Amino acid sequence: MSKRYTLLKKDGKARRGQFVTPHGTIQTPVFMNVGTLAAIKGAVSSMDLKEIGCQVELSNTYHLHLRPSDKVVAKMGGLHKFMNWDRPILTDSGGFQVFSLSAMRKIKEEGVYFNSHIDGKKIFMGPEESMQIQSNLASTIAMAFDECIPNPSTREYVERSVARTTRWLERCKIEMDRLNSKDDTINKEQMLFGINQGGVYEDIRIAHAKEITKMDLDGYAIGGLAVGESHEDMYRIIDAVVPHLPEDKPIYLMGVGTPENILEAVDRGVDFFDCVLPARNGRHGNVYTSEGKLNLMNAKFELDEKPIDETCQCPACKHYTRSYIRHLFKAKEMLAMRLCVLHNLYFYNKLMEEIRTAIDGGYYKEFKEKKLQEWKVK
């Protein structure tokens, strides 16, 4: 396997790197903008994403499999052509949705039987099916099919689940290699990331990290966090796992998180992030600023002539006032959501740019502390 990830600079444990993909080079640390159904909720287009500095878009295997179906996407030339996005795309494996959305599910060695959350139809998904769907989607990076273990879970259950996730990963790798060698595969250079699981048990996490590292995959994710555990537990697990993952591969913390979480995780050696929070919060008028979070629904913004954030260069802040955007929300105008989602994603993407600059300059710790102070609720 050719070397894709280059560690350019370390500042403490914080890593500044670049990851070469068939769809462009990713500068890390990076925040992936979540477009579950191949679009960001809030009427944000792929052209908008480029304007606000998005490097990587993340789409959801489970949802796209159900609608419009991965076969439709494949017939349309893969996700990149389908959504008109020529930069990297990561698809998750569908595992998290199978376990979180489906009340009716049976986990077997071969995979998971579950009911569609749309129409109740019985569906089966295992490692091979997840790889086949992601190959049809033709994403840049495919995630391995795993069980996202609920928190809390007993030690015995976690041990059994992690062992099965390892066996599933082996099957994912074999199937991915097979698919990438086929003549009719859209993206023959599709990459595979493995996922570390183990709940809040450090020793299980470490043993699993060592096991999956032997498979020499393109990257490694820490999964099963941000599912109800405390921030202290999350940081403890990251501290335990990162030293046992390869230094020459990217490390991805799945589903995390708040700007504060990102600063802390970067300080612990994490490279990739994704979270629905910026878009979801934006759709409800909750916006991130250089001075912390604001709720634009608040009556105090009714006559506020300032932009959302006076230091921000996003499309919303360059052209509109807090008063106007608040009015749009009260009038239930779709533009309100669009402007706030654009602002929040720009805020996250800009934060990652500043993080990379701080690591490059060797002042990441000072940068982190300064940001955390600025964001304290005033």
Roles of regions detected by a PLM:
Residues 166, 175, 179, 187-308:
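Glycine-rich phosphate/ribose-binding loops and adjacent secondary-structure elements
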Residues 151-155, 159, 219-225, 334-337:
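Glycine- and acidic
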Residues 1-18, 26-35, 40-43, 146-152, ...:
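C-terminal extensions of enzymes
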Residues 139, 170, 174-177, 243-246, ...:
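Generic secondary-structure signature for well-ordered alpha-helical cores
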Residues 129, 133, 160-171, 207, ...:
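A non-catalytic, amphipathic alpha-helix used as a structural packing/dimerization or gating element
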Residues 175-185, 249, 355-367:
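Surface-exposed helix-capping loop/turn segments at secondary-structure junctions
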Residues 1-185, 299-302:
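Non-catalytic, usually N-terminal nucleic-acid engagement modules in DNA/RNA processing proteins
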Residues 24, 57, 92, 134, ...:
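Conserved, mostly hydrophobic/aromatic
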